[in-house]
Amino acid sequence: MHFSSSARAADENFDYLFKIILIGDSNVGKTCVVQHFKSGVYTETQQNTIGVDFTVRSLDIDGKKVKMQVWDTAGQERFRTITQSYYRSAHAAIIAYDLTRRSTFESIPHWIHEIEKYGAANVVIMLIGNKCDLWEKRHVLFEDACTLAEKYGLLAVLETSAKESKNIEEVFVLMAKELIARNSLHLYGESALNGLPLDSSPVLMAQGPSEKTHCTC
């Protein structure tokens, strides 16, 4: 497909550019989350990521064009050396776990340690509990995730479902707002969380028991 120089220039015109890495154990649904964010499409069967996959999408945040580079990393041990090299230039990290598999939640401290060891200082970290559509198979309480996030000083916890389009957009909008706020801290001195509607009106799961799916720390 051919793009004119003017089309390329328009695509390259942005106010902010942020690099975000998506990490976590294998088969927690990281690729499904990224694909849904990119195209709004959910694919039931996804092959495991080999090394690192790269996706770009621009968001309009309060009249500013924010280009989000999302790096979907493989969770398998044999790819760790490759994926660790991508930590260094990341502005933010999203750690994903599968709320139907307790072991993926228990791995979160390991992933936080990886970020602290290989990432830059002051990387913004968010936690997402994926597959919240499978609430009847839940093995991780939302309250446990909030407690862990508070312990490690993470930005927020959201429960997501790529299959049912729950909180996928909100994850990246919240992250973009926080990164903009931190980038402009010397001007505004406030966190993006101060003005986010989700804080005062938590998202509720439509199917199954009524539960909060978003908390900020």
From Swiss-Prot:
Protein keywords: Cell membrane, GTP-binding, Hydrolase, Lipoprotein, Magnesium, Membrane, Metal-binding, Methylation, Nucleotide-binding, Prenylation
List the InterPro entries.
Answer: P-loop_NTPase, Rab19/43, Rab_GTPases_membrane_traffic, Small_GTP-bd, Small_GTPase
Subcellular compartments: Cell membrane
Residue interval(s) of motif Switch 2: 74-89
Role:
The small GTPases Rab are key regulators of intracellular membrane trafficking, from the formation of transport vesicles to their fusion with membranes. Rabs cycle between an inactive GDP-bound form and an active GTP-bound form that is able to recruit to membranes different set of downstream effectors directly responsible for vesicle formation, movement, tethering and fusion.
Domain comment quoted from the record = Switch 1, switch 2 and the interswitch regions are characteristic of Rab GTPases and mediate the interactions with Rab downstream effectors. The switch regions undergo conformational changes upon nucleotide binding which drives interaction with specific sets of effector proteins, with most effectors only binding to GTP-bound Rab.
Name of the molecule in the record:
Ras-related protein Rab-19
